[in-house]
Amino acid sequence: MYYWFAMPRRVLAYTKTLTADIDITKIGFYGNSWGGQIAYNMNIDPDIKCCVAQYGNGWIHYWKTNSVWLYNIPYSEPPFSDGNNLYISTLECQAYAKYARNPMLWMMSTNDFHGQFDRGFRNFEITPVQGSYAFKANASHDITGFEQDVRLWFDKYLKGSAITWPSNPNTIPSIVAIGTAKATVSPSQPSDVTAVQFYYALVTADSLARTWFTATTTNNGDGTWSAQFPYSDGTRYVFAYAQITYSNTIIVCSKQAAFIPNNL
């Protein structure tokens, strides 16, 4: 992993010498898969003006190496060796999220075999810069239909296009009745929203194996949208989020809600 971090830095150093060919004040970084992991490291460099991390988002030692799924019941972690902890704190990309300098876009599939869907949100909780994310349901290493976000992100932050980027709202869960849950979102710029689609999933801690179902969405007319959906076990996790499409074709998703109905 060290070499993967080192190589793009060498490329960046060379790129900054090409002053006759490019505007070196407008350099962005796009990383796909393992390149997504690298994007977090590159985003601590002041010469990078914005980043896109596609799929990769760290936490490899947790979910991929040790099958430590965030929503296991009960949750437990194995003892990490000193070597594990050194790797986690220096080469796992979540270690760099809190030092980010530039806007970061995370493009993801909910069931991705490389990126970790559930833990990826943590990177955006600790980052000091603007971030955004969107993900395709029931897919792995596929963002078909979402690609325009990448172009528009670079248009906004490199070209300076007058694009207002919507925020990622929280997904607020509630219980309608025993066996029926509801999720509600409050999108930014609600007058520009053209579509909202809710997804929900039940029980499965392994995000790669999770099945996402669509739920009928209701526009509440007050700037919020909601959906109701069934669950069968109030002691197990329920997951929900909304995919929000805007008139300028930007798609963002709400932050995933993961909740145990009996605890609400």
What are these regions (language model features)?
Residues 1-20:
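Alpha/beta-hydrolase active-site loop
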Residues 21-33:
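Alpha/beta-hydrolase fold nucleophile elbow
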Residues 29-31, 54, 107:
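Short beta-strand immediately N-terminal to the catalytic nucleophile in serine-hydrolase-like folds
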Residues 38-81, 134-137, 142-148:
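Hydrolase active-site cap/lid region
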Residues 63-125:
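The feature captures the conserved acid-bearing segment of alpha/beta-hydrolase catalytic domains
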Residues 152-200, 206, 213-232:
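Surface beta-strand/loop "capping" patches
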Residues 235-248:
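Short, aromatic- and glycine-rich surface loops/edge beta-strands on solvent-exposed regions
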Residues 249-264:
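Short beta-strand elements
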